[in-house]
């Protein structure tokens, strides 16, 4: 690390959520800096934020006040497909119809809300159906990544004659 930059006061992160180990390394290196994580999409802009991990470590942060969340097709655990409305949505794709401010943006994520915090469970195309039950690989991956000695984890689905699919764990 270039020690000339240790005087940073604010570090912003967006895109993928910082892993617990990376967040810890950043916090230890830049002890006086505020670490602000944003979650959003290109189409819907910012959806949630987490300042210095004040929100639950498993969430992507607190939902911005100007954001309206809709969860479509909720299951018994209140997990549903995340749809978003806010005043910062994009205007549309080139050569396609204009997107109006009241339009719901479909993120393609399965999520749930607890205490005004947004929790991502899985991408829509990553959900596994094992023995007619929804299984979200990200949930398993996050649990495994929090175990001592595990750096990375990935769960993939494999066809299975009895259950339809099974989860296969790969880790380092």
What are these regions (language model features)?
Residues 2-56, 68:
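Gly/Ser/Thr-rich phosphate-binding loop
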Residues 57, 69-72, 109-113, 155:
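A structural signal for short hydrophobic beta-strand segments in well-ordered beta-sheet cores
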Residues 40, 80, 86, 92, ...:
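AMP-binding/adenylate-forming catalytic core of the ANL superfamily
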Residues 35-42, 61-63, 156-158:
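Beta-strand->loop->alpha-helix junctions that form or flank phosphate-binding loops
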Residues 62-66, 74-102, 133-135:
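Conserved ATP/PPi-binding loop(s) of AMP-dependent carboxylate-activating enzymes
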């Amino acid at each position: 690390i270039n020690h000339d930059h240790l005087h940073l006061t604010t570090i912003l992160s967006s895109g993928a959520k910082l892993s617990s180990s990376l967040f810890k390394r950043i916090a230890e290196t830049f002890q006086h800096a505020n670490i602000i994580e944003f979650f959003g999409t290109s189409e819907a802009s910012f959806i949630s934020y987490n300042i210095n991990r004040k929100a639950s470590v498993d969430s992507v942060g607190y939902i911005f006040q100007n954001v309206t969340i809709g969860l479509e097709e909720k299951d018994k655990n209140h997990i549903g497909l995340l749809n978003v409305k806010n005043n910062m949505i994009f205007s549309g794709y080139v050569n396609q119809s204009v997107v109006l401010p009241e339009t719901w943006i479909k993120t393609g994520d399965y999520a749930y809300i607890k205490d005004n915090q947004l929790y991502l469970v899985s991408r829509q195309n990553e959900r596994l159906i094992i023995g007619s039950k929804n299984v979200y690989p990200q949930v398993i991956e996050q649990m495994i990544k929090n175990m001592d000695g595990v750096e990375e984890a990935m769960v993939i689905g494999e066809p299975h004659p009895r259950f339809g699919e099974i989860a296969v764990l790969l880790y380092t």
